[in-house]
Design a protein with these regions (language model features):
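Gram-negative/organellar outer-membrane beta-barrel architecture
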Residues: 1-92, 101, 173-179, 187-188, ...
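Active-site/binding-pocket entry motifs
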Residues: 7, 232-233
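Hydrophobic, Leu/Ile/Phe/Ala-enriched alpha-helical segments that form helix-helix packing faces
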Residues: 36-38, 132, 263
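C-terminal outer-membrane beta-barrel translocator/porin domains of Gram-negative envelope proteins
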Residues: 73-228, 234-248, 286-300, 304-312
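Short, loop-centered acidic/histidine patches that primarily coordinate divalent metals
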Residues: 227-231, 260-264, 276-280, 311
């Protein structure tokens, strides 16, 4: 059993007040809930089943009309998940290598399980990652992920696409319904369906294995990565999503590079940090009115990547 109290970033949301008056807000939701779960491992596989009960409310200040337009309140139901992993990692590794990880998730919220009657959905998502060792600690990392939703359409969306939120210690990424596409702000698109393909070439630069005197800080290694993220988020039957011929027309491509480091803080807290640059080079016109939240500049000039945790 676990208890959770956290916030979710839904990115920029626009509220139509009528008469051409559009209000733009950066929407955060606060969530509190309890989860009871069981997991059954078998060799390199893990099967799990959980019941969750969460109360969702706005953290960002909203008017009564704006709050009523969103799908808030109680979300309760079941989550079933399958995971597989056989990737390797050694003391000199900068990344997982020589293997793969797979995750398949089904999430169901229903009023008979305690959910609000506007918050009933069936959500499926999948995530496949391959790590190919090229030479010494050089790695080619590949990822294919996506998700679909059936049932009530949440105004604020189900899947968030965009940003560089990482996974691991002190990082908040890794959720089944978040897809990082670098070159976009966090959850720049939030829809009922999403798809993402990512490729990274990861290479070592230096391995200092040094601390700062007696300070509780240790630098293990510094590495680099060149990456490309290709994805989109959309609602069912939107645009050309029902036609294979037009399906990829609105997909965006973000490319860039990152400098990465593995640190030890205190006496044993491992931290992975990333700093870099990313820019959308395909279908940039879809999001060029958005700004980099760190620099305040238009994302048509690219975005600063500053994050904790592994990209994937």
């Amino acid at each position: 059993v676990s208890f959770r109290d956290y916030a979710v970033d839904f990115g920029t949301v626009f509220f139509d007040r009528g008469g051409g008056d559009i209000r733009q807000v950066h929407l955060y939701e606060k969530r509190r809930g309890v989860t009871s779960f069981i997991g059954i491992p078998y060799k390199k596989n893990l099967f799990s089943l959980a019941y969750f009960y969460e109360d969702h409310d706005n953290k960002t200040a909203l008017t009564a009309a704006e709050k009523a337009a969103l799908n808030l309140g109680i979300f309760a139901g079941l989550t079933g998940e399958y995971k597989y992993g056989d990737a390797e990692k050694f003391p000199a590794s900068i990344s997982d290598e020589n293997g793969r990880s797979i995750r398949l998730t089904v999430n169901m919220t229903n009023k008979h399980l305690g959910s609000g009657d506007r918050n009933e959905q069936v959500i499926f998502s999948g995530d496949w990652r391959e790590y190919v060792k090229l030479y010494k600690s050089h790695v080619l990392a590949l990822r294919a992920a996506g998700g679909m939703t059936w049932g009530d359409r949440l105004v604020q969306g189900t899947f968030g696409l965009g940003g560089a939120i990482g996974e691991g210690t002190l990082a908040s990424g890794g959720s089944y319904n978040y897809f990082p596409l670098r070159g976009l702000p966090v959850s720049a698109l939030s829809r009922t369906r999403a798809m993402l393909f990512s490729t990274e070439y990861r290479f070592p630069i230096i391995e200092p294995l040094r601390g700062l005197g007696t300070a509780p800080f240790f630098l293990k290694d510094i590495s680099g990565a060149i990456f490309a993220d290709y994805g989109n988020a959309w609602n069912a039957h939107e645009g050309g999503s029902d036609s294979f011929k037009d399906f990829f027309d609105d997909f965006m491509l973000g490319v860039g590079a990152e400098l990465r480091g593995n640190f030890i803080i205190g006496h044993g807290l491992p931290i992975h940090g990333r700093i870099g640059y990313a820019i959308i080079v395909l279908n940039r016109d879809r999001v060029e009115r958005l700004n980099d939240p760190l620099l305040g500049t238009s994302i048509k000039y690219g975005m600063l990547v500053l994050a904790l945790g592994y990209a994937f």
